[in-house]
Amino acid sequence: SLDRNGMLTEVSGSDTTESQDLLSYCDMQRVARVIGAPDVLEYWKSAPYLLNFLDDYQLKDEVVKALNDPQQSLALRKILGAAPHLLLSQAAVAAGKAIPSHSPRLRGLLRDMTESGAWRLLWVPPTCPYYELQDAFAAPTMKGFTKRLVFSSWRVVPKVIASLVSYDAERHAR
């Protein structure tokens, strides 16, 4: 095509922000205020469970430092104690329980993977296969399933997607 986008189709997400999503933003913003960090909106829009996945980010380094500071530690622990949705539950992960995504985009991706059965596959079936597809690759629900391009300037995003999507696939496989 003239604009060189002939093979691309933009699909708008139909995922809505839920109250728990907003609550996680508000609580993460409270954490940021305690440590004197700026607004966390851009982080929050990009990934859930920021305190678990923000390795090598100044925000997480400041939170860790504040947890070791007697003056800030109490306020921070109070927020984290009242907001368990800010951190992944080790007990839930160990038990293989479903983990709330707290992110409309991630929730949509996980829903699409579950509904289509794509969690059973190591890769997306080819669009124009050389051979007849079999088993899970031939499932009617896989006909419309497509690869997703995810763009983000944050390094945390691929880590969150890989971790939580892999966990969800393993959970379904059990």
Regions found by a protein language model. Give the residues of each.
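Helicase motor interdomain insertion/brace
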Residues: S1-R174
